[in-house]
Structures are given as structure tokens and as C-alpha cells.
Amino acid sequence: MEFGSFLVSLGTSFVIFVILMLLFTWLSRKSGNAPIYYPNRILKGLEPWEGTSLTRNPFAWMREALTSSEQDVVNLSGVDTAVHFVFLSTVLGIFACSSLLLLPTLLPLAATDNNIKNTKNATDTTSKGTFSQLDNLSMANITKKSSRLWAFLGAVYWISLVTYFFLWKAYKHVSSLRAQALMSADVKPEQFAILVRDMPAPPDGQTQKEFIDSYFREIYPETFYRSLVATENSKVNKIWEKLEGYKKKLARAEAILAATNNRPTNKTGFCGLVGKQVDSIEYYTELINESVAKLETEQKAVLAEKQQTAAVVFFTTRVAAASAAQSLHCQMVDKWTVTEAPEPRQLLWQNLNIKLFSRIIRQYFIYFFVAVTILFYMIPIAFVSAITTLKNLQRIIPFIKPVVEITAIRTVLESFLPQIALIVFLAMLPKLLLFLSKAEGIPSQSHAIRAASGKYFYFSVFNVFIGVTLAGTLFNTVKDIAKNPKLDMIINLLATSLPKSATFFLTYVALKFFIGYGLELSRIIPLIIFHLKKKYLCKTEAEVKEAWYPGDLSYATRVPGDMLILTITFCYSVIAPLILIFGITYFGLGWLVLRNQALKVYVPSYESYGRMWPHIHQRILAALFLFQVVMFGYLGAKTFFYTALVIPLIITSLIFGYVCRQKFYGGFEHTALEVACRELKQSPDLEEIFRAYIPHSLSSHKPEEHEFKGAMSRYQDFNAIAGV
């Protein structure tokens, strides 16, 4: 990439962000757009603009975000969202403190050396001699065996020590945040329940429920309340979903009748396009009556004949449930497996009956499948990354050369084509990875999202960071490697590939924070979709609410996306220190934009009380470890005699991770008894707690109950039953 293309990419991205921010300032002030820009507040019964200022100042939202407290985030979006901001602020602190030393130290050292000038072939440059302006500010301009490399080694130590400090501080803070939430005096159903799996077959003459009740009543005679046995609900769920669909269509038909005074009709065939013409209200009322009868029949069959070897067990106190969840109940570990119960809306009922050894086999099979997929997915990503450089693109498609030679087109293509191709490829992954995570037999939605996030992180690191880094170089040198496949040549290739990809990643990070966060803040696409649906499709208030329901922060993709930027910034922070400015901007702007969205827009679909943090902590350490290994290799490629001094840092990272896990992780895996023993505001309604876990498809439904509950309730109900 040429220097002009880089500036065009950066400038264009910034201009787009400014335009989107101005659009947000203008559009968010209009009352008709409130459901798009303030849905969180609306769903909580608050006035959209309460506590805010309707001003033309485009930076007013920043002031509101900066003045908000962590408790505000917890109150409006939950502990998990607050923990995500701890992650953003921790990484921002790491990069800001690192830059205080690295930028004033490393940039002058690199700029005043002359390695690039003295190297005729310039094989070590960032972009093969076409980007010398930034090459001179990178480690590529440092002469081999130079004493200046001591400063770069010191920078590796500084970044590592800063990271250890901030991670330790953050882990303590998140642990405290989780404990405070769990000590809340409010009654939460999941704190009075445990999840029991791998139950043995009941003795003759006992049902599964009688067996589990007698088992736990014997162990906990004073605190056991009752149990809810898991059932095979696939058929009853389908009937329930059809019934809900008919209720929705009936409500829609009644709304049309009220608005037009004409009774709506529809055809009974495929998609309402063919078949007999009928009165919609009478037709859907009849279908509802039929479905209710089918549902009641299937409910009786499910409760009598389809009980499974899993259950939710309830206790009269929080401390009894917390104690039971961490106790070994059977001498054989594959029987009576007990864990803390997730929230009712999180349970993946279809996974509860999967046995322990089956879960282990599934887990390792899916790990193997994901590893193979990562390797094969690297092929198209590396290929596309290689051919989307204009030089390689002209070699493969010669007839585009006249078009590419037009300066304006060439600049735009160089600025955005490779980065957009990469983003498109990564967008295909999240649903597949979430499906695979659920297939492991994981019992809760939040756990499945954490598992999918981990898989996505490794996809990103291997396919984006490593794949893109090597793609262009391999594309040009594959013949040389085939002729002379020596280890030293491959190591040299790895070392020299890093600086050559620095400008690609600078542009990639800029594209992510300017355009990505600009679209996030402005919500242009959700706004357009909402108004189109409202005008042409929605007939009932419930349909309008469904059209603007915002969803949550999408941790399964957001966390690994942030982790990729973290990894890139880490690994290039010493090689090309300018990337620290981009990393600081990404996480700083991300903190501001997401703070606004958390307080006003997104609605959490679950609460795990910060259980994502150990996953985040581990991935940050993995990125730091990769950075240290990369610097060990690159300093070695610079033939620096004291490269081995990086090894103690690598060992320290492993020890630090182990110590943190031993000290903090137990409080995230289980609820500490000193936390669970705190008093409640009022005595818990145990029957209400029990009923919270009953799948909605097993609740009673009457024909006249065809009203919609609203977007929030419907979304939670669907999660509780389908587990999706």
C-alpha cells in the first residue's frame, strides 16, 4: 500500500465517522426515532430523554457517557455489561501507559537509524519500499545487531509488566463486582436452584421425580424444597410456537378490522398464496382452539412419559443451594453431576439429558472439528488477502489493469479492498461457532456464548493475524520455498512478514473504529429497517415493538473482535509503535460509544454475573504470550545477541496466568458461601421461584389469551424454551 492510499483510507474513514456522528445527533433528537436510540430506557419504563440534554452539540453524548458511573451501567444493563467496560478500560490503560514510554523512546531511535536506506533490496521494509515514510518509524529501520535493539527489548519488558499490573487490578475489581451483585438483597430464582444431570435410572415403582425428591430430601432434609424434572419438549415446543404464531396472526387480523372496519381474509394454502379464501379472524380463532387442545394433550403426555435424567432442584435458602452446587454427591463422578443453575431464560433444555461421557466426547470432537476448520478456513482467507493486493490482482486478472491504473480507483481499492474482504469472511463464522458450542452439550446460553467466543478468538488470531501476515509473502515466495524448504528460510520468512503487514493492520484497525463505531453509534441500518417495517408490515403494537427490539451487546462476536484488535496492537506495539495510537483510539472510542449504547440501547438477554471475565483474562494473556513469542522471533531475526532475555517474560506470563486462576477463578466457578449467606429484603416466594423455571410450552394456555406481552417478554420467553 502506498502512503497516499493509507492517508486516503484514514481520512475517508474519519470523515465517514464525523458524518455518522452528526446524523446520530440529528436523528436521536426526533421523537419518532426514540425506539431506536433509547429502547433500553423505554423498556424499563423511563422517559427516553430523562436525565439527558436535547442539544445540537454533537459531543453531548460523550459527556453523558463520561459522567455515568459503573453502577448506572449495572442498573440499566447488568453486571456482564459492566464487566465488558472493565475489559475496555483495562486494555485502554495498558496501551496508554505503554505508549507513554514507547512512543517518545522508540520512534526517535527508529527514525534516526538508516537500515532501509543502506539495504538495497529492502526486503525488511513494511511495504517493499513503497511506504518508506512509515518504515522509518518502525523497527524495520533498525540495523541488525544494533545496540538500539536494547531499547526495543526493554519495551517488551515494559509492556509485559504494565499488562500484569492492569490485569491483576482488573481481576480483583471484577471479582468484587460479581460478589456485590450476588450479595444483593433481591430475590433471584437461580440463586435458590441447582442443576442436576446424569441421574441414574429410578428404582422399580418410583418415577424419576419421586426418585430425585427422595434422594435430595435425605441429604438436605431441612432445606430441600422441590424439584423440576427436565422433559423431552421438542413436540410440545412446536405446538406452542404454532399457537403463538396463530395468536399473533389473530391479533394482526383484529387490528386490521379495527383500523379499516373490513374483516380481513386469507388463503389457507402455501404461504397464504393458494387455497380456500377464509375469514382470517374465524380461521385463526379455530386454529387457536385446535392448538390449545393439542397442547394440553401433549403437555400431559410429556409430564407422564417423557421425563429425563436431569432436573432443577430448589432449596429454601441461597446458602444451601450454593453449598449443594459445589458438593460431590456421588462416589461415581458420572452420576448425580451438580452445578449452579443458570437463569431460567438461559437454560438449553435440549442439552440437559446428554450424559457426562457423551459431553466429553462431543467436546473433543468439536475441538478437533474447529481446529481442522481453522486450518482450512485459512486457505480462502490467505488466498483472498493475497490476491486483493493490486499487484497480485493484476497478475491474476490482467484485463483490469487499465481500470486499476486510474489513480482515484487505485487509491480507493488499495485503501479498502483487502480489509473489507477480510471482514466479510469473518462475518460468516459466528452462527456456525455458536451452533457447534451448543452441540457440545452445554446447559446454558451464556456458557455457549463464552465457548463460541473462545473459538472465534482462535479463528481470528490464526486466520487474520497469522494468515494475513503470511499470505502476501507466501504468494510471492512459494516457488522459492518449494525449491529450498529449509528451516532458516521459513523462520526468516515469518520474521520479515510481520513488518510488511503493519500498514494493512493500521488500516484495518482504523476501519474498525471509525466506520465500525460510526455505524454502531448512528444505528442507521436498524433505523431504516424499523421505519420500513413500521410503515409496510406492522399492524399491531406488539409487531412494532418486535421491529425495534435492539438485542444485546452480542458478546460472542464483540469480545473476540476486540481481542483481535488487542492481539494486533500487542504484536506490533514494538515493531511499529504508531499502532499504539490506533489501539488507544479503538478502545477509547469503543468505550465511549458502547457506554452510550449500554445506557440507552442494548438490553441484556441474560445475566451471568461476570463469568465472561476469566475467559477475557485468559485471552488477553494469550495475546501477550503471542506478542512475547513474536518479539523473540523478530529480535532473533535482527541477530540481537541477547534475544534469550525474552524467555523469562514468556515463563512469567505462564506463571502469572496460573496464579490468577488459582486465586480468583474459584469465585467465578461457584458462588462463595460468605456471599450467598447475606440476608434478603423479604422472604422468597418459593413457588414463584419454582414456576420461573417451568418451560412456557408446559404452562396452561386458554383460547382467549391471544394478547401479546410485548417485545421484551416474548424475547425472554423464546430464549427460555428454545434456548436460542
From Swiss-Prot:
Annotated localization: Membrane
Coiled-coil annotated residue ranges, if any: 241-309
Membrane topology of this protein: Multi-pass membrane protein
InterPro entries xrefs: Csc1-like, CSC1/OSCA1-like_7TM, CSC1/OSCA1-like_cyt, Csc1/OSCA1-like_N
Topology feature Extracellular, residues: 1-4, 109-147, 386-411, 473-497, 575, 637-641
GO cellular component, one term: plant-type vacuole
Job of this protein: Acts as a hyperosmolarity-gated non-selective cation channel that permeates Ca(2+) ions. Mechanosensitive ion channel that converts mechanical stimuli into a flow of ions: activated in response to membrane stretch. Not activated in response to membrane poke.
Keywords in alphabetical order: Calcium, Coiled coil, Ion channel, Ion transport, Membrane, Transmembrane, Transmembrane helix, Transport
Similarity field: Belongs to the CSC1 (TC 1.A.17) family.
Cytoplasmic side of membrane: 26-85, 171-358, 440-448, 530-554, 595-612, 663-724
Outcome (variant: residue 611 to E): Induces a closed conformation
The encoding gene: OSCA3.1
Subunit (UniProt): Homodimer.
GO molecular function: calcium-activated cation channel activity; mechanosensitive monoatomic ion channel activity; mRNA binding
Impact when changing residue 367 to N: In 1.1.ver mutant; promotes activation
Transmembrane segments annotated in the record for this chain: 5-25, 86-108, 148-170, 359-385, 412-439, 449-472, 498-529, 555-574, 576-594, 613-636, 642-662
Cysteine pairs bridged by disulfides in the record: none
Protein's organism: Arabidopsis thaliana
Full protein name: Hyperosmolality-gated Ca2+ permeable channel 3.1
